[in-house]
């Protein structure tokens, strides 16, 4: 038989190296917020004319029960000073910190400047401030969902003369109840939480558990961040 040569097997091609592609975790988007908002919406829950929202949960009995919790009669100041050292930096809505102006002073009185006008010596002042520059409650007319605000009212109902629906005056006789302080900064062993830290539901639940308190429907929850 004649000589023959074995055919060489073709060399195996090396598979291209797999790229190590790590999926970047997606952050919260506006679409997420809109979707969740529709899912959890309470619009219409208390009727089409409602302007109170979850304050409807507070009943006279809840206020009476809250009053029974007072033991020591201590009063805690939660307000901010109305002065130029407030929290506003102008980055949102062009807001500024309160400007306190004296219109009449004790030195005016001593100098006799008031005696010939009203015959009364007095001090008087005024404060110039956006309403978001100190301690305050947001009305349901404050933030819009598209062209609507709470309960489906048209955003145009807030005009240059003020809010014709969902104004803060609707809360005047409703903001009474049991207060629960959740000291998240203390739970995290921080004097203050870092700027921009997002407090999660788990943070609130764990803080409440550590403090031995239970947040109930109709409670007013105050969260301490250490920022102020």
Where are these regions (language model features)?
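Active-/binding-site microenvironments in catalytic and ligand-binding cores
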Residues: 7-228
